[in-house]
Regions:
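Catalytic-core helical/loop segments in enzymes performing group transfer/polymerization on anionic/lipid-linked
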Residues: 1-462
């Protein structure tokens, strides 16, 4: 209620503190005086939050590490990225509220439902804002953002994961019929590309020798979704593995049997409350009771998802012979599953560089790179774009014989392009991300926007 806020501020009885950029914008737009929670955190605390999140996502290594394993794949590891997406913004709010409470411990607090859960662990003198409003529990991978481009306009919309998978399964009926590996002999060796974008890698696919022995395995994304992806697959003659190629009665039974054990495994892995309360803490404040319910729900959801994916991947590696497997990440759930199972089948795995990485020697950067899977851990070799990244890999302990410099397959086709008559400027920048504590600050968000605006102003006048 903005009018109530304005009146309270005028009476000097309210201090308004925002915890997100949207609220900050709304209050600014209505000229309502407020503070931002970022002002209660210094740089060291933000860096500590980031470091702590990287540590906490490895919780499964500390207590009963084998309890969450299924066919040699640890389900706790598969949810590290998604758990980090949740933890970083949560910890930032948690620490900020601790600091605010330390300054105003005798105050009466009012907070939104998510923040109320934190404040009530510190004081009983707190009430909920919008108490009757419904809050939907949603995790990062519960929905999928679908990008669309119409002429020169780009936009995106969100689909629930379940709806997305239903649409994907429908489309894969036709994909299996026209591009499935049914003509491939099961003992004929092939190369497996995992979660590859056929548009981005179309030149690589079309120029590869024996492209018919290349198989694409995309579980998170559709392999064909528009005319460009269709043409890329058709031109390359590579094969696409879908659920319709692998599913049978035995596989269905294995999945159901695996899913039946989830409840017991989750309960057992989270049975040591004393450990969990001590482990999930920061600055001597435990937050386990705040996240316990959400965390259990997340673990159950992802355990069920993972069992299905592990069984499907196992069937794939049993049905076909692969001379090698190529992944562009070791942290994606599909990639982790395939890489772990490949070890059992003695199939070599190659990690392909997929982006420009920060290569400074700062501790925080190195920690981030390791978390994001920049360096091969389970892969046998890595392919990098050039000698800069090769040196970066060498400095971080990767053996030279395990590094190949082969350039960037994204841009192979650009060499033969004529220079365009119309000048274009490509602004290749990534904005602030929710899994980085410093990126979540209002200062970083506004600085990023101001920088882009300034670049546009300057380049427009060139």
């Amino acid at each position: 209620n903005l009018k109530e806020l304005e009146q309270g501020i005028e009476d000097k009885s309210y201090l308004v503190i925002t915890f997100d950029y949207e609220s900050h914008q709304l209050l600014n737009k209505n000229n309502i005086k407020h503070e931002i929670s970022d002002s209660y955190l210094n740089r060291v605390e933000l860096e500590t939050i980031q470091k702590k999140s990287y540590e906490l996502v490895d919780w499964f290594k500390e207590e009963k590490p084998n309890e969450l394993e299924y066919k040699g794949v640890n389900v706790g590891s598969l949810m590290r990225v998604e758990f980090n997406y949740f933890l970083v913004p949560f910890l930032k709010n948690f620490v900020a509220i601790i600091k605010i409470y330390q300054k105003y411990s005798s105050a009466e607090f009012s907070a939104s439902i998510p923040l109320h859960e934190i404040v009530k662990t510190l004081t009983n003198n707190v009430k909920k804002l919008n108490e009757n409003s419904a809050t939907k529990e949603e995790f990062y991978y519960d929905s999928v953002l679908i990008p669309l481009k119409i002429k020169n306009h780009s936009f995106s919309f969100k689909l629930s994961k379940n709806r997305f998978l239903k649409l994907k399964n429908i489309s894969e009926k036709s994909i299996h019929q026209f591009f499935g590996p049914k003509k491939l002999h099961t003992n004929e060796k092939s190369i497996l590309l995992v979660e590859f974008d056929p548009v981005r890698y179309r030149h690589f696919l079309s120029t590869s020798k024996n492209a018919s022995s290349i198989m694409l395995y995309n579980r998170r994304r559709p392999t064909i979704w528009n005319s460009n992806s269709y043409n890329s697959i058709k031109k390359s003659n590579c094969r696409i593995v879908t659920l319709y190629d692998l599913m049978n009665k035995n596989l269905e039974i294995n999945i159901k049997n695996g899913e039946s054990s989830v409840e017991d495994k989750v309960s057992s892995s989270l049975s040591n409350t004393d450990f969990l309360e001590a482990y999930f803490s920061i600055y001597d404040h435990s937050f386990w009771k705040i996240i316990e319910k959400k965390f259990k729900n997340l673990l159950k959801k992802r355990f069920i998802d993972s069992i299905k994916e592990i069984e499907i991947a196992s069937k794939l590696l049993e049905k076909y012979q692969f001379s090698s497997i190529v992944v562009w990440s070791e942290i994606g759930s599909t990639e982790q599953i395939i890489v772990k199972l490949a070890k059992k089948h003695s199939i070599p795995v190659v990690l392909l560089q997929h982006g420009l990485f920060f290569d400074d020697e700062l501790e925080g950067t190195n920690r981030m790179n390791k978390f994001r899977g920049v360096f091969p851990v389970d892969s046998d070799e890595t392919i990098v774009w050039g000698h800069i990244e090769k040196n970066h890999q060498l400095k971080n302990g990767i053996r030279e014989e395990n590094i190949q410099v082969l350039g960037n397959p994204y841009y192979d086709r650009i060499r033969n392009r004529p220079n365009p008559k119309i000048n274009h400027i490509l602004l290749a920048t990534s904005g602030p991300v929710i899994e980085n504590s410093i990126d979540l600050t209002i200062e970083t968000i506004e600085k990023n926007q101001a920088t882009i605006k300034k670049i546009c102003e300057v380049t427009t006048n060139l």
